[in-house]
């Protein structure tokens, strides 16, 4: 068993995903209405986490939006990243966290995020072995991708509001790709 003091911590922020095969690494994130899906293949000894802001894309990915904030994109990236590291789809298992209702509005984005993640995993045939979603407070999540161990800490009201402020900040748009071709 890896001592927590010796574990190397890798922080996952909104719009990111990481795939790890090192038992001494713990992935960590802070969630409000966002959701983190933690997937692993226990036989291959590889796992990962993503952190998404919204469930799906309202418009085409070619419309110039930042696809990394959407669950549909990050779920595919995480699964493909695991497969590239030797995982097999039929051995994947998932844990899902987040999706709190952090803002009093008619729309509950957190609930939509959590429902999206659960439906996506169900559609892909990936069993959810554990989940902690919903509520009114954010959470800090730690996930050891090789062992599958996960731990969460509830955030206070003030901490949740800080997380809400971060989630509402616009994600930096990726630099435009230069489509020009230069011939030598």
Swiss-Prot record:
This is Probable chemoreceptor glutamine deamidase CheD. The gene is cheD. Keywords: Chemotaxis, Hydrolase. Its EC number is 3.5.1.44. SUPFAM superfamilies: CNF1/YfiH-like putative cysteine hydrolases. Probably deamidates glutamine residues to glutamate on methyl-accepting chemotaxis receptors (MCPs), playing an important role in chemotaxis. It is an enzyme of class 3 (hydrolase). The keyword Transmembrane helix does not apply. Belongs to the CheD family. Disulfide bonds: none annotated.
């Amino acid at each position: 068993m890896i001592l927590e003091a010796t574990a190397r911590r890798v922080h996952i922020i909104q719009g990111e995903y990481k795939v790890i095969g090192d038992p001494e690494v713990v992935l960590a994130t802070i969630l409000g209405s966002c959701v983190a899906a933690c997937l692993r293949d226990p036989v291959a000894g590889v796992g990962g986490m993503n952190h998404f802001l919204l469930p799906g894309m309202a418009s085409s990915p070619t419309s110039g939006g930042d696809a990394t904030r959407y669950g549909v994109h990050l779920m595919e990236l995480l699964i493909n990243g695991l497969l590239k590291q030797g995982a097999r789809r039929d051995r994947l298992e998932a844990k899902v966290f987040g999706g709190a209702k952090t803002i009093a509005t008619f729309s509950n984005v957190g609930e939509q995020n959590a429902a999206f993640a659960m439906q996506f995993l169900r559609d892909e045939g990936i069993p959810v072995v554990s989940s902690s979603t919903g509520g009114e407070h954010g959470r800090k999540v730690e996930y050891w991708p090789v062992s599958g161990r996960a731990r969460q800490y509830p955030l206070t009201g003030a901490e949740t509001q800080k997380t809400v402020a971060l989630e509402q900040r616009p994600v930096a748009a990726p630099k435009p790709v230069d489509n020009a071709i230069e011939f030598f």
